[in-house]
């Protein structure tokens, strides 16, 4: 049935839908592909289409199959549909059809394709001859089982020692191991199972190596790509020749160029390159120098001389790419090697087939399935042996009135085959509705095949007369005009079918549709010129991180967010900002930069989990328990905070027996040495006993219980919770425990297997990801990868890391894989022990390079289209010469030349190369896209502000003002006038506790806790009971709904007053009341306190303090530090002599410390209320208050005296009483 326009209802004037959206909702009668650009409302359209099929066409919801990409999107889709059905039912309560839908929605097939396949298998398991009580394998189980399968298969082939297998191992294994060989087998496994017929795909891999016609096709493909570079080289050489021809005394240069012109003319004549000429060509070792004589003869033409030489250098680099990448060997050699490689490739394919079969058997024996089994078993149910739809498939065809597929660009060929089995009709009369955007296809690493979308996009038409119907949703309801028009301009000159795999034409571009006001927010393209190592101690990446922090500050201080619903502005907050990068490689630098600037920052990284200190500690423990003969992990455990062996102690142990193979042997030998330090021997005895205890425990208990025992025995959770970032550290430790629980629920058991599982994850670079401890509404700046940002939107997007090179590492592998073309293997001469490129490896390497750049372009598109208000692009260069080079990228018609795009090294080359051209006044017309951008229409007119910043200019040293916060981290930068004191303070506050703490005692206590403990002990209370309470009690943050709507409690007002006092400026000209109000307003602007806090701040009490003598004494002090944290050893503070006494690490926070004439004072603020009993004098009240805080103040004073090695005085300041001096 054809789509008839009359079948689509007339669109009323008052509906919100665009014409294209309206058509997408109501069109039917054939397969429909909706190309939905970013922000075009595709989800809303999909939901509305489902609803209208139910309401208008009386289709039951359970007769629609809706396929989404994730379980989360499936749940959201189902919820939206259910809500709309309920709304319709309330409006028409007597409608029986709607009443039925409210029941049937619970059986509706709105799910991922994997979920649909699983349901299919559960209903038709008899066709597969499998046990119906199967379960889904865990990640750990699947990884280990595949590894074990590869072990078994390779072992079988090692036993056979087939000559071709020997050649493969010689080529793909190293002298030490066969890791690379195994990795290639795994890659081939995953590539093959992404096809409907894995064995058939594998069997075809050797065909190009055998069949001459396929080799000729590969030669033509290489020729076409090489010709692009050779012609570009010819143009560069011609430009060089033209410039040198205008000059004097350059005969030698012209002679060289003339020789090269003869060569390249001969190489590119005809349609086929002369490969013999190219392979045999040799350049002059050095181009004739442009000496002073030439410069004198061409006075005033220095720039032209340099430009002529640059064109020649560019020509040479282009020819060298062709020579090295495409024709390092002549055509005859390339084809001859293919014949010799054929049996080797066939044997490799056979190994992978053996792995697939054996892996299937292993899974069957355990009665488990993985996600690829879901797809292949479903396909087995839906197809006959000849590939035609089965009887079961026919029943599903009859059942489903329509199949709707979201994110169609991310499907693979197996999924495409499944859909084709259950859809009805052909494309011209089918019932398949597909929504997606190929410009956002960024999952090639998961075997997503964007060519499926592209093929349909090119085949379907907007009229739908010949095949399927194509509808373009191009209107964007997310972003401001500046974001859209700049994105359009960039991609119109960067993306086409040659590089990008799709033409960015009028249908593909974005059109402004959001109801923003007319305030201009141009895209910022920021180029950061690095400071040299002479001018900065920071690396380029660290400089960029600091630069990004400055952009965030600028947004917070100057930008507003427009609410499209109300038409009002609000101030920008941290949660409005996201930093997007290609990967998490810059995460650590950004975390440090934001931490240094006290800006809340969160990165939910999928990388770096195994690098976290707390995780490394536990893994060292597990590896040591499994095998203590691993020196790195054993010593790491000994040096850890748990056992605290010093470097001196480790050296002392090693010196006794320096020739031992393992450090564990050295420990044993030291313990029996007559001259050994008895104290160290005792310490080692306790350590060895611990190891043996845990080894015995691990023999009978699962891994997660071993981890739990380690946590409890040594208070690991409590210790790491007390450090900076304690929430995240605690979550990471629990995350590792949970992974161990999941592992034990698989068919694998034991410590060794768990460690192997972890090692495999690390080798695959497949992290768990740091545990997420931040909610969606938390006011923090977020960093995420472009992949994880897909589908999200943010008012402000900082797209950084643009200068990071594209990852082309896979292109250098000895085996190149391509889903469409197959396998390209280098030729390895076993006798010469040398590898050479083969015809297939050269061709597939070139194809993969092109596809890689295309996917990187799509990633750029996704990043740019996340922004609502403003987009900030950040790239980094060594010097401004690089920027000039980018501006001068060659232009071919309306695009950056193909050769420039294929050789681009990073996104910044492309982005800056396009957007900077129209703003470069000196650029010749042949390097521009247009002479005047004002002639462009609004949809493609770039609105971009280009800023070039030198790091030296934007990185001013932090100036310490009287009213700034002094923290431990800033002590290095503060000039106290007493360097010895400063060094001692820093060393003591950063001190690593060297002695083993009794593991049954808390590892860390606050001064307040010690105060309670000592008060309790003085009352003869049992210590263990107090410790149990202190460790076990939960400390929860007060929920926001309580703090926002209820009157503040006394402790909250106390915290608020401390925050105000922490930032209070001290100056000899006292603050006035108006200035105090202005200061509080600044704290609200900086979000240090809530806006409604003003009414709870006791202004009069603070003014009383400001007008008092203590304020003036502090204002006149030599140095002032506020909110100074400390972590010290209780032994040092209390003067204890034995490490076996009840000791802990003490932590606390001193409100203020100041120094006057060499004397240090501390001040502790108190907001306590007190009862003045009748007849009590001020002196009596003061004594009562001092007695109440005597223990706490004693610890503060002793702590500071321990650190500073000098007497310290202190004050208690009560806002409701006044100043009390601490007694000696």
UniProtKB/Swiss-Prot annotation:
EC number: 3.1.-.-, 5.6.2.4
Domain UvrD-like helicase C-terminal, first and last residues per copy: 497-791
Cofactor(s) needed for function: Mg(2+)
Gene Ontology biological process terms in this record: double-strand break repair via homologous recombination
Swiss-Prot/TrEMBL catalytic activity: Couples ATP hydrolysis with the unwinding of duplex DNA by translocating in the 3'-5' direction; ATP + H2O = ADP + phosphate + H(+)
Assembly mode: Heterodimer of AddA and AddB/RexB.
Protein purpose: The heterodimer acts as both an ATP-dependent DNA helicase and an ATP-dependent, dual-direction single-stranded exonuclease. Recognizes the chi site generating a DNA molecule suitable for the initiation of homologous recombination. The AddA nuclease domain is required for chi fragment generation; this subunit has the helicase and 3' -> 5' nuclease activities.
Protein name: ATP-dependent helicase/nuclease subunit A
């Amino acid at each position: 049935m054809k789509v008839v326009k009359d079948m689509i209802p007339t669109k009323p004037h008052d509906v919100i839908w665009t014409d294209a959206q309206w058509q997408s909702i109501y069109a039917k009668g054939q397969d429909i592909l909706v190309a939905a650009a970013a922000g075009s409302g595709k989800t809303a359209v999909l939901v509305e289409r489902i609803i209208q099929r139910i309401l208008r066409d009386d289709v039951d919801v359970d007769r629609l199959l809706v396929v989404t990409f994730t379980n989360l999107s499936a749940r959201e889709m189902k919820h939206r549909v259910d809500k709309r059905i309920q709304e319709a039912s309330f409006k028409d309560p007597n409608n029986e059809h709607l009443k039925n839908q409210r029941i049937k929605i619970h059986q509706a097939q709105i799910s991922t394709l994997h979920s649909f396949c699983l349901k299919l298998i559960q209903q038709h398991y008899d066709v597969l001859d499998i046990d119906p009580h199967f379960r889904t394998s865990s990640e750990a189980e699947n990884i280990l089982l595949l590894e074990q399968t590869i072990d078994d298969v390779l072992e079988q082939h090692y036993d056979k020692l087939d000559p071709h297998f020997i050649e493969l191992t010689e080529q793909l294994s190293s002298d030490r191991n066969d890791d690379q060989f195994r990795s290639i087998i795994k890659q081939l496994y995953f590539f093959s199972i992404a096809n409907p017929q894995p064995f058939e795909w594998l069997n075809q891999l050797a065909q190009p190596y055998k069949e001459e016609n396929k080799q000729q096709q590969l030669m033509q493909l290489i020729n076409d790509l090489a010709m692009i570079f050779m012609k570009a080289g010819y143009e560069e050489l011609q430009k060089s020749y033209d410039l040198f021809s205008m000059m004097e005394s350059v005969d030698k240069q012209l002679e060289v160029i003339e020789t090269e012109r003869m060569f390249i003319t001969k190489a590119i004549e005809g349609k086929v390159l002369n490969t013999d000429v190219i392979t045999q060509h040799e350049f002059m070792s050095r181009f004739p120098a442009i000496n002073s004589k030439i410069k004198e003869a061409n006075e005033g033409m220095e720039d032209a001389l340099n430009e002529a030489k640059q064109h020649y250098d560019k020509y040479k680099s282009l020819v060298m790419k062709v020579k090295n990448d495409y024709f390092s060997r002549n055509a005859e050699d390339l084809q001859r090697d293919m014949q010799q490689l054929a049996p080797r490739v066939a044997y490799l394919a056979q190994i992978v087939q053996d792995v697939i079969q054996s892996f299937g058997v292993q899974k069957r024996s355990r009665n488990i399935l993985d996600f690829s089994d879901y797809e292949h078993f479903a396909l087995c149910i839906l197809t006959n042996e000849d590939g035609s739809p089965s009887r079961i498939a026919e029943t599903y065809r009859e059942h489903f009135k329509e199949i709707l597929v979201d994110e169609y660009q991310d499907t693979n060929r197996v999924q495409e085959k499944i859909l084709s089995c259950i859809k009805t009709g052909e494309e011209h009369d089918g019932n398949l509705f597909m929504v997606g955007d190929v410009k956002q296809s960024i999952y090639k690493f998961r075997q997503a095949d964007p060519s499926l979308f592209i093929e349909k996009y090119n085949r379907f038409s907007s009229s739908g007369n010949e095949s399927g119907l194509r509808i373009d949703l191009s209107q964007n309801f997310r972003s401001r005009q500046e974001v859209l028009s700049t994105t359009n301009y960039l991609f119109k000159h960067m993306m086409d079918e040659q590089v990008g795999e799709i033409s960015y034409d009028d249908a593909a571009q974005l059109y402004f549709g959001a109801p923003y006001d007319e305030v201009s927010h141009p895209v910022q393209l920021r180029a950061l010129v690095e400071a040299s190592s002479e001018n900065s101690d920071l690396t380029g990446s660290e400089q960029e991180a600091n630069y990004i922090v400055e952009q965030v500050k600028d947004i917070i201080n100057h930008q507003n967010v427009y609410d499209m619903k109300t038409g009002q502005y609000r101030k920008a907050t941290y949660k409005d900002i996201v930093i997007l990068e290609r990967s998490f490689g810059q995460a650590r630098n950004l975390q440090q930069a934001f931490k240094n600037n006290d800006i809340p920052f969160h990165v939910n990284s999928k990388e770096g989990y195994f690098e976290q200190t707390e995780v490394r500690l536990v893994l060292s423990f597990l590896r040591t328990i499994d095998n203590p003969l691993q020196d790195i992990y054993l010593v790491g455990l000994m040096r850890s905070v748990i056992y605290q062996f010093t470097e001196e102690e480790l050296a002392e142990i090693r010196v006794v027996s320096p020739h031992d193979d393992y450090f564990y042997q050295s420990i044993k030998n030291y313990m029996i040495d007559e001259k050994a330090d008895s104290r160290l021997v005792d310490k080692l005895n306790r350590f060895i006993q611990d190891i043996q205890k845990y080894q015995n425990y691990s023999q009978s208990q699962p891994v997660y219980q071993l981890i739990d025992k380690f946590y409890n025995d040594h208070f690991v959770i409590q210790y790491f919770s007390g450090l900076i970032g304690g929430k995240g550290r605690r979550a990471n430790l629990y995350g590792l425990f949970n992974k161990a629980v999941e592992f034990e629920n698989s068919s694998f058991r034991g410590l060794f297997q768990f460690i192997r599982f972890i090692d495999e994850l690390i080798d695959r670079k497949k992290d768990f990801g740091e545990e997420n401890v931040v909610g969606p509404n938390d006011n923090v700046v977020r960093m995420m990868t472009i992949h994880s940002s897909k589908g999200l939107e943010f008012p402000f997007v900082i797209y950084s890391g643009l200068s990071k090179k594209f990852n082309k590492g896979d292109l250098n592998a000895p085996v190149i894989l391509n889903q469409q073309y197959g396998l390209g293997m280098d030729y390895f001469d076993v006798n010469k022990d040398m590898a050479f490129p083969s015809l297939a490896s050269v061709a597939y390497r070139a194809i993969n390079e092109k596809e890689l750049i295309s996917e990187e372009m799509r990633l750029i598109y996704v990043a740019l289209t996340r922004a609502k208000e403003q987009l900030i692009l950040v790239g980094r260069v060594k010097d401004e010469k690089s920027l000039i080079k980018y501006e001068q990228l060659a232009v071919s018609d309306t695009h950056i030349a193909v050769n420039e795009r294929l050789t681009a090294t990073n996104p910044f080359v492309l982005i800056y190369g396009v957007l900077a051209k129209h703003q470069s006044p000196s650029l010749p017309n042949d390097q521009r896209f247009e002479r005047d951008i004002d002639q462009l229409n609004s949809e493609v007119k770039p609105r971009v502000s280009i800023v070039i910043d030198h790091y030296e200019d934007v990185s001013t040293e932090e100036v310490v003002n009287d009213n700034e916060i002094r923290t431990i981290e800033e002590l290095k930068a503060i000039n106290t006038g007493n360097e010895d004191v400063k060094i001692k303070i820093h060393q003591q506050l950063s001190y690593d506790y060297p002695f083993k703490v009794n593991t049954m005692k808390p590892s860390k206590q606050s001064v307040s806790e010690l105060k309670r403990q000592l008060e309790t002990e003085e009352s003869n209370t049992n210590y263990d009971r107090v410790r149990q309470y202190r460790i076990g009690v939960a400390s929860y943050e007060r929920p926001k709904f309580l703090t926002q709507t209820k009157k503040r409690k006394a402790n909250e007002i106390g915290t608020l007053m401390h925050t105000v006092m922490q930032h209070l400026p001290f100056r000899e000209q006292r603050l006035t009341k108006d200035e105090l109000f202005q200061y509080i307003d600044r704290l609200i602007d900086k979000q240090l306190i809530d806006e409604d806090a003003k009414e709870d701040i006791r202004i009069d009490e603070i003014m009383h303090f400001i007008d008092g003598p203590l304020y003036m004494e502090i204002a006149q002090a030599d140095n002032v530090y506020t909110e100074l944290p400390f972590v010290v050893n209780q032994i040092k503070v209390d003067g204890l002599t034995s490490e076996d006494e009840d000791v802990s690490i003490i932590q606390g926070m001193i409100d203020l410390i100041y120094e006057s004439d060499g004397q240090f004072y501390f001040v502790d603020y108190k907001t306590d209320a007190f009862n003045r009993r009748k007849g009590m004098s001020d002196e009596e009240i003061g004594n009562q208050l001092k007695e109440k805080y005597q223990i706490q103040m004693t610890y503060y004073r002793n702590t500071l005296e321990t650190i500073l090695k000098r007497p310290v005085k202190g004050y208690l300041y009560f806002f409701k009483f006044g100043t009390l001096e601490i007694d000696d």
